[in-house]
Amino acid sequence: MLKKTAFNAPDGQPYQLVQLTNSNGMIVQFMDWGVTWLSCKVPVNGELREVLLGCKVEDYPHQTAYLGASVGRYANRIANAQFALGERTIQLVANQGKHQLHGGKEGFDKRRWKVEECGQNFVRFSLVSPDGDQGFEGNVQVTVIYTLTDENSVKIEYEAESDKDTALNLTNHAYFNLENAEQGSDVRNHTLRLNADFYLPVDGEGIPNSPLKHVVNTSFDFRVAKPITQDFQQGDQVVTKGYDQSFIVNKAWQKPCVLLTSPNEDLSLEVLTSQAALQVYTGNYLAGTPTREGDTYQDFSGIALETQCLPDTPNHPEWQNYCGIQKAGERYYRWTEFRFK
């Protein structure tokens, strides 16, 4: 179902909203501005429960938490807003101090995407990112497909192709709270399990400052499920006020890389992906972000589980075998599936 809002987006045109429903009554909603995942209502014990943090549609351009947005051209950070590509230095638009975050000041989250096709259980959006966009080289054609299945899962597929070599790293920035996403209870009371043996330390600005580290004997060891609170703000988390680090996903696509469980264990979320890494962000700076009810969220109200490449990969050739630099004319394809049980 496609509808337009009575009010306008920053480009002066109405937002276009798409709603999908499955046979179990699960309802998801998306919009063309930023290809944003607006809402996810899952049936739990005979009632629909909102599990996605969100705000009023008209507030999306003003919030800075990237709620539910598709981010690019390069998700996460690129140090000093520049990197070497061949013999050239690519200078990007900085938007977080001297660094670039999530593609720059006018990243993919701040664009109107075209609704290409809307079916019974899916919607497909497209965007053309021109050569020089936020400093990146190459004309890039991007497609995002959201699919809702009757198994209560949401699958996100990213397809892209560039006519020049370019940095490319696409993800969705949804925040989950399986207990209370409307007001945002403390997500640290959830239990988390990660299928990951290595994580990437960063400095206080989110820039990698160390090689990959094994999780053993650290607070980043989630190979056995534990409450997020258990080792919170220990070790390499101190400089980021909580978890805001990337993990290398153990390559077993048929197995979830994430299992998130609500405090009373009445709902869980499994994440499967073809991506190489996962950024876990516990909403350490969510305070002041608007809610759907006109209130504001507090810090730690939701957890972002962003499947992607490692941050700053364009400046680290040793990580580019995972992903991060897209060759001209080659198809980019990544998928992530969020299963609610």
Residue locations for each model-derived region?
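An exposed, glycine/acidic-rich loop-and-rim segment of catalytic or binding clefts
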Residues: M1-K341
